[in-house]
Amino acid sequence: METFDLESHLQDAYSRFPEAKHQPVIGLTANYEGIDATLRDRYYKQVIAAGGTPVIIPPVADAQVIVNTLEHLDGLILTGGGDYNPLWMGEEPSPRLHNINQERDAAELMITRLAFNRQIPMLGICRGIQTLAIALGGKVCQDIKQLVKHSQDADRTEPTHIVEIKKDSTLYNIYNKEKIFVNSFHHQAVSEPGNHLRTIAKSSDHIIEAVESSEYKQILGVQWHPEWLEEEGLKIFQWLVNQANNFYAAKQLHKRILTLDTHCDTPMFFPQGIKFDHRDSRILVDLHKMTDGHQDATTMVAYLPQPQIGESFSSKVAFDVKGPAQYADLIFDKIEEIVSKNRQYLSIARTPADLYSDKRNGRKSIMLGIENGLALEHDISNVKHFAQRGIVYITLCHNGDNDICDSARGCNTHNGVSSFGEKVIQEMNRLGIMVDLSHGGEKSFYDALDISQTPIVCSHSSSRALCDVPRNLTDDQMRALAAKGGVAHTTLYHGFLRKEGEADIMDAIAHLEHAIDVMGIDHVGLGTDFDGDGGIRGLADSSELINFTLQLLRRKYSEQDIVKIWGGNWLRVMTQVQNFKH
């Protein structure tokens, strides 16, 4: 019997602790009519039945409001409704266009793009699948040519046509069927999914009925209304709530652990006047993307291109400098300038302790490195100079032999590490600088292992067993590296992950897991090579790095192991190297 006693209604919460178990928070976009923001109850009731906590989002096209809303969401549902104004797609209106809803359009396109930036799981329903397409670069047909009735007169709970599903899809995994029966209430449909989505289901008249992410993200759009299809429809909501739960777990994990990328080349774009405090489309690493991807720290290197015989160094760089050392100094000056402009949010870290301090204080960290010992200009005193600038490693060479060692893409000038290179390694040991053999030739690698008194590292190197290119490490190299306590970090340069086809996040995971199989969990990590041609589908920039964590969680890696992969192993070696300083 209904009671009007408030205390009795609260008793369930008050009689336990915590008052409620965690449920992922699912935002649902509201419709708008007249002066009312509304939502049909079937949407939020299905969310509750699936184990989520629904929150209705009013149509407010204010980025500040939307961003603050998204901070509290674990998943997002883009609900059904009227037509989109075709001007959002650069099109003139068709005579068959129905009612548009200007209050919703901008607000929902903005929230979709901002949620996409943050990797928030999304489900688009009817108009919502069209929202996904428009926001992510696709197209919507203003009025479909119908061979099948797509706007039924039957009750909303009654399925009226068949949808054919691709087997390699999220939808097939949900239903384990190639055909399902759905309801239908639309005259528009996605005509082109765009680069970020792919078609996974069609009706018999070839209308796109469902799309999903083409980048292994948790995004699904359906043209029908599963909220009305009871148990059959509930399965889609359960999928979203499950993905939202996983996303929540990954976010919580990132709050507890330190995440460090050991190699990026963002300074290569400094001549273009990039803005690190903007979401800058020219670069893959900036404050916005690091925040969206829950990334704590990156290692920015001064990359020095290796001149060919007869070339001058100054002809290969954009800045007017006297030589490699001055160029590296200029890069570090510019990084320091970026940090000084963003001190509330950004810091230069020189030690593991600095990284942890920055995380506690809510700042992102940049560590400094040199990619190509050419920066030393054959002057051993420059090792000390750059140590004083705060670098944590030097990659001994790049693509081409230098005066330190032979490159993986060199011509065996020294048969490994040169006599000068041996002195450089010894001085790096003395000054607490990590010796990085990414790009090094195989003989150089083994020479450095023998010479160095501290473990060496490979900041961005993948597996030759999976992608047979000289730049990658053989299994024997990996075993030798691990035996000396070193680490090798899988890189996201597509040509080092696969020789044919397009590399993606699954290739990166395969290389990581091969390295774990060969070396053990204590010797692996991630060095993206972002802005140095690194970046693949699913891990295209810093905003997508939480997807790496999601893949590790799906594979049941423990928190302890994820800590190691996300930089713990690297920082163990850094501590050992810096403690050896004398």
Where are these regions (language model features)?
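N-terminal hydrophobic targeting/anchoring segments and the immediately downstream early-domain regions
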Residues: 249-413, 468-489, 493-526, 530-582
